From Swiss-Prot:
<feature type="binding site">
    <location>
        <position position="87"/>
    </location>
    <ligand>
        <name>substrate</name>
    </ligand>
</feature>
<keyword id="KW-0378">Hydrolase</keyword>
<feature type="binding site">
    <location>
        <position position="202"/>
    </location>
    <ligand>
        <name>substrate</name>
    </ligand>
</feature>
<feature type="glycosylation site" description="N-linked (GlcNAc...) asparagine">
    <location>
        <position position="386"/>
    </location>
</feature>
<keyword id="KW-0732">Signal</keyword>
<dbReference type="InterPro" id="IPR001547">
    <property type="entry name" value="Glyco_hydro_5"/>
</dbReference>
<feature type="glycosylation site" description="N-linked (GlcNAc...) asparagine">
    <location>
        <position position="133"/>
    </location>
</feature>
<keyword id="KW-0325">Glycoprotein</keyword>
<feature type="active site" description="Nucleophile">
    <location>
        <position position="323"/>
    </location>
</feature>
<dbReference type="GO" id="GO:0048046">
    <property type="term" value="C:apoplast"/>
</dbReference>
<feature type="glycosylation site" description="N-linked (GlcNAc...) asparagine">
    <location>
        <position position="153"/>
    </location>
</feature>
<keyword id="KW-0964">Secreted</keyword>
<feature type="glycosylation site" description="N-linked (GlcNAc...) asparagine">
    <location>
        <position position="17"/>
    </location>
</feature>
<comment type="similarity">
    <text>Belongs to the glycosyl hydrolase 5 (cellulase A) family.</text>
</comment>
<feature type="glycosylation site" description="N-linked (GlcNAc...) asparagine">
    <location>
        <position position="343"/>
    </location>
</feature>
<dbReference type="InterPro" id="IPR017853">
    <property type="entry name" value="Glycoside_hydrolase_SF"/>
</dbReference>
<dbReference type="GO" id="GO:0071585">
    <property type="term" value="P:detoxification of cadmium ion"/>
</dbReference>
């Protein structure tokens, strides 16, 4: 306990001086770019595992809890985790980033500034998501409600994708984000190489049009807009990876039945020219609750392998597994089962990367810091606990880093 208190105290001191450290100790790494199915950083292929920490800006809004961000990032680098995925939104509600359309809470924005500055100082790349599909933290529902309050004829959350005013709200948020000047680093977000890329939305879905055409049209419009205001950063969709009408065989053999009404199409959504890399998530426990553990593990491997095959041969773009995990509330759960999921996931990613394939890394859901009980859930992991799962994370991330060190470019023809 004394050791932990010392670490937390040290983290607080670092956090209090971060406005200087974030600038003076900034990593010299450049922007992550793409060449064929690989990411490139400083002229070499870039492979890296990472984690989700959606709570960064929320906790960093209060300067007295910013040490949690520092502590998590320090622990992440110890375990060779060098990408973090986080929310670039909190629409309405407590500690909102966007209080109303185009109206932002400066204190909350400074929380996101701090998280980016700390990631920069400690050499961690960031993937930042613009909005949520779900009503958690506002999301599509909040945007539609804002439009409804102005007298717009909207009745469904899916109007988010078609209503002109709602679409303009989204574009305004994107523009505000990319033009934000970080109060710690003094660098505009669009010029910040610490940001690896943006995601259009967290797990976009459109039940109003199961064909996928509405969502694809929205993604095309918004992806082109993002690129028009920020040409330096990579962009992806934030999709779960469910197949649509463009891949009928994959749709039948891989999708959970419930996913076939969500209006997403892994191939069509990612073939868009302005989308730089593919995004998938993996939760076989949630998607196939009636299957036994062995069957779910086999489906996990097949899910990853098929998406990697399509990223290589059809999309010709890199792929990041943006979310995965093993919930502790799965009936019959054991630590060994969680370890098996992490091993299978990381092994599949590594096998692709070692061959110069499209797998760039896996980001598990999700990391919390010691004592963060308000964010604890069946999927949360505390790195400092050094569980068997954490040991697997460390070993596999170091292996992936060694591929990066070899600097071999793919010979794949594009």
């Amino acid at each position: 306990m004394k050791c932990l208190c010392f670490v937390v105290l040290l983290a607080i001191l670092i956090a209090q001086n971060s406005s200087d450290l974030g600038v003076k100790s900034a990593s010299s790494d450049g922007f992550v770019s793409r060449k064929g199915v690989q990411f490139i950083l400083n002229g070499k292929p870039f492979y890296a595992n990472g984690f989700n920490a959606y709570w960064l800006a929320y906790e960093a809004t209060d300067s007295t809890t910013r040490f949690k961000i520092t502590y998590v990032f320090q622990n992440a680098t110890i375990h060779d985790l060098t990408i973090v995925r986080t929310w670039g939104f909190r629409d309405g509600g407590y500690r909102a980033l966007q209080i109303a359309p185009g109206v932002y809470d400066e204190k909350t924005f400074q929380g996101l500034d701090f998280a980016i500055a700390e990631a920069k100082r400690l050499g961690i790349k960031m993937i930042i998501t613009f909005v949520n599909n779900y009503s958690d933290f506002g999301g599509r529902k909040q945007y539609v409600d804002w439009a409804k309050n102005t007298g717009q004829n909207v009745s469904s959350d899916d109007d988010f994708y078609t209503n002109p005013l709602v679409k303009q709200y989204y574009k305004n948020h994107v523009k505000t984000m990319v033009n934000r000047v970080n109060t710690f680093t003094k660098v505009e977000y669009k010029d910040e190489p610490t940001i690896m890329g943006w995601e259009l939305m967290n797990e976009p879905q459109c039940r109003a049009d199961p064909s996928g055409k509405t969502l694809t049209a929205w993604m095309n419009e918004m992806a082109l807009y993002v690129k028009s205001v920020d040409s330096k950063h990579l962009l992806s969709t934030g999709l779960e990876g469910f197949y649509g009408d463009s891949s009928p065989q994959r749709k039948t053999s891989l999708n959970p039945v419930a996913a076939n009404v969500l209006g997403t199409d892994f191939i069509a959504n990612h073939k868009l020219d302005a989308i730089d890399f593919a995004s998938i998530h993996s939760y076989p426990d949630l998607w196939f609750p009636n299957l036994d553990e062995k069957s779910r593990l086999n489906l996990l491997r097949k899910w990853l392998e098929c998406h990697l095959e399509d990223a290589q041969n059809i999309l010709k773009k890199p792929l990041i597994l943006g979310e995965f995990g093993k919930p502790t509330n799965t009936p019959g759960y054991t630590q060994a089962q969680r370890d098996a999921v992490f091993n299978a996931t990381f092994d599949t990613i590594y096998e692709s990367a070692e061959k110069g394939g499209p797998a760039a890394g896996a980001l598990f859901w999700h990391v919390i810091s010691d004592g963060m009980n308000n964010f604890k859930d069946p999927l949360s992991i505390v790195l400092s606990e050094n569980s068997t799962t954490v040991n697997i994370i460390t070993e596999e991330s170091r292996k992936l880093g060694l591929i990066r060190g070899k600097g071999k470019l793919s010979k794949t023809k594009i």
